[in-house]
């Protein structure tokens, strides 16, 4: 019989420290985004969603939904197997071709999530090149950290976005190397000096691996990300279909031989049921639509700037960055949860508290993600209510 005590102790400690996670029960109604329905403990009411990663609202777009309906009626609900055993459909192949085309790469490979894509790819690279040294940005995502850990390769950590520190590590480590970093960091919203990192990595003949999860669909002429925007060539790109493209799944792109080796050697890819063809159909439609509609990228940046300006106008400090992400640092987990609850329960504003372990202790925050569909009225209303909630919870700014 399982002893419940150690598990309950963990939960009690999380609750006491303010780091216990509560999953809010919401329903997003098609055509109403960013308004949603919240099934709260005391009532059911409309809320305005300020923390969705469906950055462009493509998860609600009629073209995406219609293509998924068609695929559902044509191919059924599930893939029916792993990619090797009956789970590769025309929809999977078409989507992988489109992703390779988007990033101007030779090949692409789908995964069930971008987390899975990162962890599995990095782990498998370690199997293929056992003496590979991974050089990782100190702010990299959990999926990257886990991938490096499971690779069993040596790793060095360079200071966040510090090209000089990166070069010193590259210089002192001969042999095969891979520099792993992100383009847009999801919690602070800062953008890496991608061009400089790639240049110094190439100087020392290192493989470059970039996570563009919070950039694909949002930056670059066709939405291929920061690499496209900055006109730079990277060896391996990790991306997602679940944020700007509004559906589900992750992927990697790169040289044909590299992708084929990962496909052939990655256990977590080989032994997993593949994405539903319905998901693939929706993602393919979304990518093509977003590629052809740069006004969506322009609008989300304009909405982010507007949101930052209005928050600062009220005397509230916003963490400075050049991206679409709007972080407001609270600096205390209990207060962060309290402000979030005030906004949700009293004001109908939904922004999830971001606490440890997602961010470092002492940097707890509310992370706002304005979309092209947040109006001026939404922004003004949220900012006034945020200021009041901060005051009621004992934080003036």
Language-model features, listed with the residues they occupy:
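Active-site PLP attachment segment
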Residues: 222, 228-261
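Conserved PLP-binding catalytic core of the aspartate aminotransferase-like
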Residues: 298-305, 312-348, 363, 370-372
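PLP-dependent enzyme catalytic core of the Aspartate aminotransferase-like
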Residues: 58, 62, 66-70, 74, ...
């Amino acid at each position: 019989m399982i002893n419940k005590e150690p598990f309950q102790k963990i939960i009690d400690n999380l609750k006491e420290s303010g780091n216990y996670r509560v999953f809010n029960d919401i329903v997003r109604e098609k055509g109403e985004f960013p308004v949603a329905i919240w099934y709260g403990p005391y009532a059911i009411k409309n809320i305005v969603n300020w923390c969705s990663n469906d950055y462009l609202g493509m998860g609600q777009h009629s073209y995406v939904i219609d293509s998924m309906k068609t695929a559902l009626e044509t191919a059924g609900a599930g893939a029916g197997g792993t990619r090797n055993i009956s789970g590769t459909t025309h929809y999977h192949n078409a989507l992988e071709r489109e992703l390779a085309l988007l990033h101007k790469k030779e090949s692409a490979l789908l995964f069930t999530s971008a987390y899975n894509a990162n962890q599995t790819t990095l782990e498998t690279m370690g199997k293929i090149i056992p003496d590979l040294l991974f050089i990782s940005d100190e702010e990299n995502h959990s999926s990257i950290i886990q991938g490096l850990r499971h690779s069993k390769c040596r790793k060095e950590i360079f200071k966040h976005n510090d090209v000089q520190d990166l070069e010193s590590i590259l210089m002192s480590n001969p042999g095969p190397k891979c520099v792993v970093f992100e383009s847009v960091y999801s919690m602070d919203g800062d953008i890496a000096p991608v061009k400089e990192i790639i240049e110094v990595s190439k100087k020392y003949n290192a493989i470059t691996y970039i996570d563009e999860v919070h950039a694909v669909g949002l930056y670059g002429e066709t939405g291929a990300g920061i690499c496209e925007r900055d006109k730079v060539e990277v060896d391996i790109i990790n991306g997602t279909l679940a944020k700007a493209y509004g559906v589900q799944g992750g992927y990697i792109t790169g040289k044909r031989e590299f992708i084929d080796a990962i496909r052939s050697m990655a256990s977590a890819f080989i032994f997993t049921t593949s994405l539903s063809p319905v998901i693939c159909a929706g993602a393919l439609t979304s990518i093509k639509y977003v590629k052809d509609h740069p006004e969506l990228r322009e609008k989300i940046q304009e909405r982010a700037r507007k949101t930052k300006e209005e928050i600062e106008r009220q005397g509230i400090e916003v963490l400075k960055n050049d991206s679409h992400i709007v972080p407001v640092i609270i600096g205390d987990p209990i207060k962060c949860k309290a402000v979030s609850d005030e906004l949700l329960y009293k004001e109908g504003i939904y922004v999830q508290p971001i606490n440890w372990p997602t961010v470092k202790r002492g940097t707890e925050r509310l992370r706002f993600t304005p979309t092209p569909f947040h109006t001026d009225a939404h922004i003004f209303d949220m900012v006034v209510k945020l200021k009041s909630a901060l005051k009621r919870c004992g934080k003036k700014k």
